[in-house]
């Protein structure tokens, strides 16, 4: 079955690479990531999203609208993240500056695949802050009538034609889970970028 084929073999990676099993408020020692190539991200998000049957799916931002940021490489099969920081400590810092800080520390910004894994394992993370995922970037920037068909609230002005937007996960409307996007230079007191120390795969 799926677990025996894809997940159980990852156990051998833990024996060599981690002894830390302490879960703290903003620190998660280990996460299993199932990438879009194995299980579509929209399906994963729908299984996690609360009250999904009450929401019109055509107005939901789709995970497939994002791709890895330049220079970011992730496995195409299930893998592990070690030493995950949820982004709580990075609040009030724009995603672009967070990426630079992560690079200086030898850490990696989480992607949209990894963010969905994070809130699937630990949904309580979103009770304290929005989780920005600058390891991915928005690739679809729709305009005109197609905006509403694709789920965006408004078209992007010309000045943003070359701007970079990154995915963000948050709770709105009484714990309704939402995937959206944020400009990479936006600084907010309720949003922070998540990161990990390493990615491990077989």
Regions found by a protein language model. Give the residues of each.
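A binding-site-centric feature that preferentially detects glycan-recognition modules on secreted/surface proteins
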Residues: 1-108, 115-202
């Amino acid at each position: 079955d799926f677990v025996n084929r894809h997940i159980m073999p990852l156990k051998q990676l833990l024996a060599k690479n981690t002894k830390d099993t302490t879960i703290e408020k903003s620190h998660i020692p280990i996460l299993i990531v199932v990438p879009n190539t194995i299980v579509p991200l929209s399906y994963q998000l729908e299984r996690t999203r609360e009250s999904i049957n009450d929401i019109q799916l055509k107005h939901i931002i789709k995970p497939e609208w994002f791709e890895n940021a330049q220079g970011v490489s992730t496995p195409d099969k299930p893998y592990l993240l070690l030493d995950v920081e949820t982004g709580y400590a990075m609040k009030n810092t724009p995603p672009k500056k967070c990426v630079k800080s992560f690079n200086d520390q030898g850490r990696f910004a989480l992607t949209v695949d990894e963010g969905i894994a994070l809130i699937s394992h630990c949904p309580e993370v979103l009770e304290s802050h929005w989780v920005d995922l600058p390891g991915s970037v928005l690739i679809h920037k729709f305009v005109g009538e197609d905006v509403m068909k694709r789920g965006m609230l408004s078209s992007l002005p010309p000045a943003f034609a070359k701007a970079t937007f990154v995915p963000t996960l948050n709770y709105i409307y009484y714990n309704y889970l939402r995937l959206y996007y944020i400009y990479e230079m936006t600084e907010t007191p309720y949003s922070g970028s998540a990161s990990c120390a390493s990615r491990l795969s077989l």
